Amino acid sequence: MPSARLQQQFIRLWQCCEGKSQETTLNELAALLSCSRRHMRTLLNTMQDRGWLTWEAEVGRGKRSRLTFLYTGLALQQQRAEDLLEQDRIDQLVQLVGDKATVRQMLVSHLGRSFRQGRHILRVLYYRPLRNLLPGSALRRSETHIARQIFSSLTRINEENGELEADIAHHWQQISPLHWRFFLRPGVHFHHGRELEMDDVIASLKRINTLPLYSHIANIVSPTPWTLDIHLTQPDRWLPLLLGQVPAMILPREWETLSNFASHPIGTGPYAVIRNSTNQLKIQAFDDFFGYRALIDEVNVWVLPEIADEPAGGLMLKGPQGEEKEIESRLEEGCYYLLFDSRTHRGANQQVRDWVSYVLSPTNLVYFAEEQYQQLWFPAYGLLPRWHHARTIKSEKPAGLESLTLTFYQDHSEHRVIAGIMQQILASHQVTLEIKEISYDQWHEGEIESDIWLNSANFTLPLDFSLFAHLCEVPLLQHCIPIDWQADAARWRNGEMNLANWCQQLVASKAMVPLIHHWLIIQGQRSMRGLRMNTLGWFDFKSAWFAPPDP
């Protein structure tokens, strides 16, 4: 019998007997474990061989045998739990232990660096599963980061300085305002072994032609081997950066026929997905990656929903052994913000916008927050920390305003915290705030109407590219803000948009009301090198490494 199964049987027997040695019979024990008398005898003999108990059998009708426990079920359960942790079987660990507080304590104690069979393993604790990693779909902040570790694109953007770099394409040139040419590397392989072909690249870029930022791509052809020509309907100075974004990452052309591709995707990036469940995401360094092989062999993201109730300001890489060290922190490039929905009469009413933005000002939200959040929140007066576009102007409550509807996407604890503060403030003004939580996909599509929306945005480098690109690619914003998005996109592509002025107009009209900038923190081990926090609050796994202990 496999050791794990035998351990489970012993723990169950120990629990049924309440850990007490006793006189009993094979029939009674078999009934406790719901097995045959013969199988019960085999179990007892095997457990006795392991040194867990003694079984002194008595022969004869009416005679009772002696069962003595030498090992406690708790000790064996702890040993089994340790084995499951080392094997990264978090789902089985949760079933075995049951108690969430104990599971969390065990997980935290095993965070950070592990060295097993010559491999460097990094363990990270996160509050929710990362089940959708499909480029071009609605991806949240962390899924966006993970997708960048799994997939490659024609170009890539350096997370530290925002500079454009080569990826699958090693060079490119602009032939004319409407014609770009990219030269691709040969010998690039997907994680499932097949070599990348030009048809994969063409299919990947054609599949996103329906997205607003890619709708101006008229044609994609390969005139010669490993050469790609992209023809546009509008000039686009940002095209090389646009092709380095997550939606433009390269998928195998047969991706729709592959099982569970969204949660177990196959790319050409530095890491391949090994496991992705509700309890764990495991990615492993791809030995055939066309660039520098990752220095960390394996990254395990353990999911523990209970930590969602804590302030989401830090990424925890290290357990409690010794003092936690703050490796890096930064104020996010982005903010939480209110979005007024012009499709509802209250959302479109300028008096309602002025008054709500006055009573729900950033300083009011921070003032009414608990101290643990005040340490991580900074009042926002623009979409970026360096901007001061919003001015707090006293406004009178509109006559007849008795209720408002606020909607945000679920699985985000700080949304609930901020919404609760808003509800408290508005109640003091005799306004009822009805709160709705919807899925991230529903939020992204924006087909549901709400007076106001609570959103957040994290912009990546370079900011003059990503800020408009991020806002333009969220359908919800286009539904709520009635401006000519296509005309603005054309001006942005031509380099004719003053981005700061454009954002200031959105804030001045109260279409968007900045609320809070968030401090992002990574805590971990001093032995980790090459760790540079990006604007998403994560770091590039393939560039990090562990320094060996001093000799």
From Swiss-Prot:
Q: Where is this region: Solute-binding?
A: 163-492
Biological process according to GO: negative regulation of DNA-templated transcription; peptide transport; positive regulation of DNA-templated transcription
Every HTH marR-type domain range: 1-116
Query: Mind telling me which InterPro entries this protein's record contains?
Result: SBP_5, SBP_5_dom, SgrR_HTH_N, Tscrpt_reg_SgrR
Q: Which residues bind DNA?
A: 26-49
Instruction: State which residue ranges cross the membrane.
Output: none
Pfam families reported for this sequence: SBP_bac_5 (PF00496), SgrR_N (PF12793)
Q: Which residues form the signal peptide?
A: none
Which of UniProt's keywords are assigned here?
Activator, DNA-binding, Repressor, Transcription, Transcription regulation
The terms under GO molecular function for this entry are: DNA binding; peptide transmembrane transporter activity
Please give the function described in this protein's UniProt entry.
Activates the small RNA gene sgrS under glucose-phosphate stress conditions as well as yfdZ. Represses its own transcription under both stress and non-stress conditions. Might act as a sensor of the intracellular accumulation of phosphoglucose by binding these molecules in its C-terminal solute-binding domain.
Record protein name field: HTH-type transcriptional regulator SgrR
Q: Which gene encodes it?
A: sgrR
